[in-house]
Amino acid sequence: MSASSGDYREVAPPGPLAASLVCTWAQTVGARAQRVLPDGCADILWIGEDAPVVVGPATGVTLAALPPGTIIAGARFRPGRIAAWLSLATDELTDRLTPLADLWRDADALTARILAEATPDARRAAIAAALLDRAPQARPPDPLVAAAIGWLARQPRGRVADLPALVGLGERQLRRRFQVAVGYEPKRFARILRLQRLLALAERAPAGRGRLAALALAAGYADQAHMARECTALTGLAPGALLPGAASALALTDFFKTA
């Protein structure tokens, strides 16, 4: 994170939570509003002293602007995993903020436990501990959707049209199960996954002539023009404007850890 965005720290989840969580994280908000890019994940967040919310998977960019000094702490769930922890289909959370109290009866007690901690990292650690306590109540994820997510993550040029045969479901049935688990249909998820792959590759790619064209192909786009259209559609920025600042995005997720 850049200093003007605030101090931001991610911590890998403890072993029993690794299949469900990308990380727990905490941030003290800085002076600059922040672009949060779609990543297919859902978060449970405690923002300042407010009641916690579930932030559903996003279909586009969000501009987050909070008072400087606000403490945010939360847990980021892997694509397709939060539905196992909630009695609600993920597509009912997409592009929404849902009060956690609407979904967990003990949300108030959980909040008292977390907000008793004064520092961002202590709140983050309290969230991890609370989820560890709750883990036995989580249902298993949909195994066929998990297989589809894993295949898309491993195949930069994988075709969504091939998924039904690969997982043994009809197209309509797979689409519905995918929406329930992930929050949107496989094609949209593949687009977001490709964007996140591009961001991850851009962090390591050397500067030089032909960089954008090479990144486009490595990330799974048909060509540089395809990459430009998709970046603009999903983030509001062309690749040349987006990629230099990729490391300052909140939602840089390692999709390739598909436990």
Predicted regions and their residues:
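DNA major-groove recognition helix of helix-turn-helix
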Residues: 178, 190, 230-231, 243
